[in-house]
Amino acid sequence: MFSVARTAIRGAARPAVRIARRGYAETASVDKLRLTLALPHQSIYNQKEVTQVNIPSTAGELGILANHVPTIQQLKPGVVEVIETNGETKSYFISGGFATVQPDSELSVNSIEAFQAEDFSPEAIKSLTAEAQKNAQSADEAVAAEAEIELEVLEALAHFAK
């Protein structure tokens, strides 16, 4: 009696699984990645087709292409590199944020701020790094913790602004 019920359940479940797979594969047939790079005050990219986007995730550096597996990633301070369909590469320094890849080859990158390399002065970065290193040695735990965060951001920024 139970084996008949199991067989009936398996038989009923199979078509649903096939339909779900078939629907997902049809949705993911897009050739280009659509990027939205949004800040609270502006959208740098709004549903623009691009070839690839490299993001600084807390899990490591990720290269996102069309048909990438859906994911949500927390971003650390670093460089978002956008390779456009014409082959041109644009880079933006972000202080952190989140990236979401949807099943339909859509990538949303949300950050508080994003800047291009020419927006930074290497001298100012060195000066701020020296000040943050001094503050990291502070006896005040709050000041030291804040300085450690500043150092992480400034280190990533120094590599970007070279």
UniProtKB/Swiss-Prot annotation:
SUPFAM superfamilies the record matches: Epsilon subunit of F1F0-ATP synthase N-terminal domain (SSF51344)
The record's CDD domains line, in alphabetical order, gives: F1-ATPase_delta
Q: Which organism is it from?
A: Yarrowia lipolytica (strain CLIB 122 / E 150)
Here the disulfide bonds are none
Gene name, per UniProt, is ATP16
Name any Gene Ontology BP term: proton motive force-driven ATP synthesis
Q: What's the protein name? A: ATP synthase subunit delta, mitochondrial
Q: Which domain of life is it from?
A: Eukaryota
InterPro entries under this entry?
ATP_synth_F1_dsu/esu, ATP_synth_F1_dsu/esu_N, ATPD_C_fung, ATPsynth_dsu/esu_N
